[in-house]
Structure formats: structure tokens, C-alpha cells
């Protein structure tokens, strides 16, 4: 049996004097597609940074409270080759960061081998890397974008390129952090359909979001976060009830399920 993707045992992450994750204990199994759902400020971003080892939790008695793929000590770059990551923040850094979108799509995908934003001067790019990058773009329906700069693309096109970047190392897990922020309705649907196919092809999904509509039918488990703690963990039908969502988001909601997706409205006024 493979090791769990993530094991946390009373993990606490502090920013300033405030815990953003507070004695968090949970296990995410391999091949169990999981959504982390909660409002802004619930600790979702801190959870991602903990998973990728950008943040380290407080250790009690010299024992690490976190294990990723069964290990508590990782080289960060080696770990990131096992975790493909797509986020709106990464999108913003590629398009509006230091390179101001000048990175070509093929170079952006190749940068996934180095866990960098673009290819560093000392990075050695092999023919095998170029082949795998081209295959990743093809898989995401973005081969025609290879020679274009990211800032010349629509948000949906750029997000597909970043999805190819996340998959170029054949990671064990795809981490999606608020993945459809900034996408219109059509682009969002197309993006999530590609994510569904990735899940069906065998890559474990970890989806971090505050949008219930992003929870694709392949998600088998939902973890509700509130104020840095697990408020509930269970299957989607058990987690996405009006009572549990009100407890986490602080507002009365109506929940409907259609086509395997969940849709919510604020109770009482019909607003989405």
C-alpha cells in the first residue's frame, strides 16, 4: 500500500502571533481526490504552503508534525517534482511578475522541471524534457500556444499552459489552489473538464477553494476548514449540507446537486 499523500498531527503554523493553522490533524490518502473548502482566512493558503514546504509547522519535542508521501524530510525541489501546482497566484506571477508575461508557453512548461518561474540560466534542458513539455501542451489542447507569450493569451489559454507545466514531471498529485479565479464561465467549465480527465487518468487531486461549484464529481472527500481548524471531514454529500456550510461560512445557504456538481445560493433572497 502506498504512503498517504499527507499526514498532519497537531500541526500549527503561526504568522506573527496568530496561528493560521491550529493543531491541524488529518490524513489525505493517495488516489483519494480531496477538496479543502473554507472561506477567506480559514487557513487554505497556509495549508498549501505547508504541503509544498514553503512553511514549516511548529515541532513538538523535536518531532515533525508533517509527513508527505511518508517522509518528514524533503529536498524542496524534489518534493515539488511530485506535486504539480496550479493557482491564480502562479498565473499572476507568470503574467505580471518580473518577466511581465514575456515567458513563452513552451519555456513556462519546461520551467516545471526546475520548479522555477521560467528557465534559469544554469538550467540544462534535455531533448527528453522538450519532448515531455510538448506532450504536456498537446494533452492540454495547448500545443498551438507553444511559441506565444503568456501575456498575449486569454486567461483560459494561460491557465491551460500552467496546467501543462504542472503535469510535465508526471507528478503523483495535482494541487489546484483557487484554480478558476479570473476565468469566465466557458473557460472555467473547460478547465475543470480537463481536471476531471486528469483525475480519471490516475493523478490524485487536491483542490483548495472557497467555490463549491469547483468541486468536481470525482472528488471523494471534502475537508471543511474554519479558523485554521478542521470543522468537518467526509464525503461530499455529508460535508456540503446547508447546516455545515452555514457553520463554516457564517451564512444560511441552500444547496442543490445537479449533474454531479453542487450549487449554492444564500437562503432567503435567491442570490448566488
Model-assigned labels for residue ranges:
Residues 209-210:
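H-loop/switch region of ABC-family ATPase nucleotide-binding domains
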Residues 222-235:
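H-loop (His-switch) and adjacent beta-strand-loop-beta switch element
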Residues 170:
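Conserved catalytic motifs of ABC-family nucleotide-binding domains
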Residues 6, 20-23:
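Conserved structural motif at the start of ABC-family nucleotide-binding domains
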Residues 246-272:
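ABC ATPase nucleotide-binding domains
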Residues 174-178:
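Catalytic Walker B motif of ABC-type/P-loop ATPase nucleotide-binding domains
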Residues 77, 88-152:
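ABC-family P-loop ATPase nucleotide-binding domains
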Amino acid at each position: 500500500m502506498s504512503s498517504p499523500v499527507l499526514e498532519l498531527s497537531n500541526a500549527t503554523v503561526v504568522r506573527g502571533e496568530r496561528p493560521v493553522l491550529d493543531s491541524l490533524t488529518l490524513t489525505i490518502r493517495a488516489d483519494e481526490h480531496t477538496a479543502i473548502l473554507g472561506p477567506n482566512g480559514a487557513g487554505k493558503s497556509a495549508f498549501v504552503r505547508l504541503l509544498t514546504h514553503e512553511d514549516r509547522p511548529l515541532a513538538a519535542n523535536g518531532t515533525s508534525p508533517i509527513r508527505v508521501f511518508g517522509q518528514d524530510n524533503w529536498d524542496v525541489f524534489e518534493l515539488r517534482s511530485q506535486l504539480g501546482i496550479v493557482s491564480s497566484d502562479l498565473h499572476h506571477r507568470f503574467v505580471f511578475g518580473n518577466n511581465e508575461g514575456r515567458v513563452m508557453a513552451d519555456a513556462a512548461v519546461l520551467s516545471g522541471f526546475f520548479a522555477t518561474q521560467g528557465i534559469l540560466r544554469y538550467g540544462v534542458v534535455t531533448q527528453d524534457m522538450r519532448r515531455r513539455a510538448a506532450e504536456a501542451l498537446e494533452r492540454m489542447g495547448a500545443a498551438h500556444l507553444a511559441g506565444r507569450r503568456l501575456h498575449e493569451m486569454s486567461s483560459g489559454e494561460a491557465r491551460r499552459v500552467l496546467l501543462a507545466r504542472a503535469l510535465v514531471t508526471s507528478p503523483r498529485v495535482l494541487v489546484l489552489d483557487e484554480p478558476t479565479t479570473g476565468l469566465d464561465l466557458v473557460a472555467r467549465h473547460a478547465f475543470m473538464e480537463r481536471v476531471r480527465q486528469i483525475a480519471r487518468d490516475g493523478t490524485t487531486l487536491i483542490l483548495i477553494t472557497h467555490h463549491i461549484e469547483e468541486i468536481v464529481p470525482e472528488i471523494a472527500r471534502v475537508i471543511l476548514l474554519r479558523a485554521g481548524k478542521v470543522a468537518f471531514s467526509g464525503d461530499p454529500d455529508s460535508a456540503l449540507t446547508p447546516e455545515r456550510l452555514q457553520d463554516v461560512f457564517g451564512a444560511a445557504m441552500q444547496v442543490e446537486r445537479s449533474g454531479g456538481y453542487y450549487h449554492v445560493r444564500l437562503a432567503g433572497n435567491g442570490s448566488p
